[in-house]
Curated annotation (Swiss-Prot):
Tree of life domain: Bacteria
Record pathway: Aminoacyl-tRNA biosynthesis; selenocysteinyl-tRNA(Sec) biosynthesis; L-seryl-tRNA(Sec) from L-serine and tRNA(Sec): step 1/1
InterPro entries the UniProt entry points to: aa-tRNA-synt_IIb, aa-tRNA-synth_II, aa-tRNA-synth_II/BPL/LPL, Ser-tRNA-ligase_type_1, Ser-tRNA-synth_1_N, SerRS_1_N_sf, SerRS_core, tRNA-bd_arm
Catalytic activity: tRNA(Ser) + L-serine + ATP = L-seryl-tRNA(Ser) + AMP + diphosphate + H(+); tRNA(Sec) + L-serine + ATP = L-seryl-tRNA(Sec) + AMP + diphosphate + H(+)
Family affiliation: Belongs to the class-II aminoacyl-tRNA synthetase family. Type-1 seryl-tRNA synthetase subfamily.
Species this protein is from: Paenarthrobacter aurescens (strain TC1)
Free-text domain note: Consists of two distinct domains, a catalytic core and a N-terminal extension that is involved in tRNA binding.
EC number: 6.1.1.11
Protein name according to UniProt: Serine--tRNA ligase
GO molecular function, one term: serine-tRNA ligase activity
Residues at which ATP binds: R259, R260, E261, V275, E346, L347, T348, S349
Subunit record text: Homodimer. The tRNA molecule binds across the dimer.
Length: 426
């Protein structure tokens, strides 16, 4: 949720943000109008309430016919107060409805445009050239080494489901363990998070539970399956006042994640690039507004550290405004090279959500002045970033493959696989 006061005082920057996203600018003026209506309705209600209280004192002192006349006026005034209260509540609801629609304010420097308008910030490593043999794709390799079984995944659960077995299961567990250990070393608190959340938690994080076709819902229980542990970690401190005096609060959540992939018909139908269920280690940070940008850079650095450990060539992109999603004010993606696709594919994403999620979830910090005296509260900033996920297996298998289909294990991962240096062909 955006800051209404900031929007009212600086409407042009919010209009510019909407333009950068390719979104409707008129919502800015609609919110300003709704806020004006809300304020006017509230003033009317408070004025009538004051009159009602004053009349109460007059009635108490009056006698006879005067009292009867005043009682009639009090009754009429009570009806007016009730109507004004309903008007104020309706105006408040209208404003809140509009605030649920407008996305976060993008920060300065974010590229304008849509999915293809990203800016490449840097490229690290060189895509492997296969001069001696034709590279196999990750599914063919996964079947050769007994790591991936798509056929039985489809038999059991349907399309875009799979089994990781043998070295495939071990490789994913190794990746997640290495990621979690790195996070712990960086000061993150490890968390195993719920994968089912209430609608208010999903909405508070920035998802539209009514219209988002990507979300699985358990209608009977009114619970939603998360597509990332970011949702549960964001809701963890809902309606709380945090102490950030000692620095950011950092959590690393591990969970299964679920996505319907409703808009992906025909895309990435082979293998495990785009699936309905996967596992992930997600970093999540609560910090001050002033520290948010620096924390965003740190999250990116931790993601790059993991990519380096896996010895993968990659690039970092600054995602364009129209591809940010509801909550993000800025997002960096790390994309690893996938040889058989001759393309970079996203492995990590890190977003600075500024105060957007915190306002929705009512997460605040206490403001202390220079004299050490508390001066109220304000919204915190939240950030998130992927540290490892099932999709990494795609890039690892393809980039580190040998002519026979076996796969060299990146050195940093070997200790998590019992010293295994090569994933052999069965």
């Amino acid at each position: 949720m955006i800051d209404v006061k900031d929007l009212s005082e600086n409407p042009d920057k919010f209009r510019a943000s909407q333009r950068a996203r390719g979104a409707d600018e008129s919502v800015v003026d609609a919110i300003i109008s709704a806020d004006s209506d809300r304020r006017a309705a509230l003033i009317r209600h408070e004025t009538l309430r004051a009159e009602q209280n004053a009349f109460g004192k007059k009635v108490a002192q009056a006698k006879g016919e005067e009292k009867q006349a005043l009682l009639a006026e009090v009754k009429e005034l009570a009806n007016s107060v009730k109507a004004a209260s309903a008007e104020a509540a309706a105006a408040q609801a209208k404003q809140e409805e509009l605030l649920r629609v407008i996305p976060n304010l993008v920060v300065d420097g974010v590229p304008e445009g849509g999915e293809d308008d990203y800016v490449v910030l840097k490229t690290v490593g060189t895509p492997r050239e296969f001069t001696d043999f034709e590279p196999k794709d990750h599914l063919e390799i996964g079947e050769l080494i007994g790591a991936i079984d798509m056929e039985r995944g489809a038999k059991v659960s349907g399309s875009r489901f799979y089994f990781l077995r043998g070295v495939g299961a071990r490789l994913e567990m190794a990746l997640l363990q290495m990621a979690m250990e790195q996070a712990i070393d960086a000061g993150f608190v490890p968390m195993i998070t719920p994968t089912l959340v209430r609608p208010e938690t999903m909405q508070g994080t920035g998802f539209d539970v009514k219209h988002d076709a990507e979300i699985y819902r358990l209608a009977e229980d009114d619970l939603y399956l998360v597509g990332t542990s970011e949702v549960a970690l964001a809701g963890y401190h809902a309606d709380e006042i945090l102490d950030l005096s000692a620095g950011p609060i950092r959590y690393a959540g591990q969970s299964s994640c679920y996505r319907r992939e409703a808009g992906s018909h025909g895309k990435d139908t082979r293998g495990i690039i785009r699936v309905h269920q996967f596992n992930k280690v997600e970093m999540f940070i609560y910090t001050t507004v002033e520290e948010a940008a620096a924390e965003h850079e740190r999250l990116l650095a931790w993601e790059e550290e993991m990519l380096a450990k896996c010895e993968l060539p990659y690039r970092v992109i600054d995602t364009a405004a129209g591809d940010l999603g509801m909550s993000a004010a800025r997002k960096f993606d790390c994309e690893a090279w996938v040889p058989t696709q001759n393309a970079y594919r996203e492995l990590t994403s890190t977003s600075n959500c500024t105060t957007f999620q915190a306002r929705r979830l009512n997460i605040r910090e206490r403001v202390i002045n220079d004299e050490g005296v508390a001066k109220g509260t304000r919204a915190v900033a939240t950030l998130n970033g992927t540290l490892a996920t099932t999709r990494w297996i795609v890039a690892i298998l393809e980039h580190h493959q040998n002519p026979d289909g076996s796969v060299n294990v990146p050195k940093a991962l070997q200790k998590y696989l019992g010293g295994l240096e090569v994933l052999p062909v069965l």
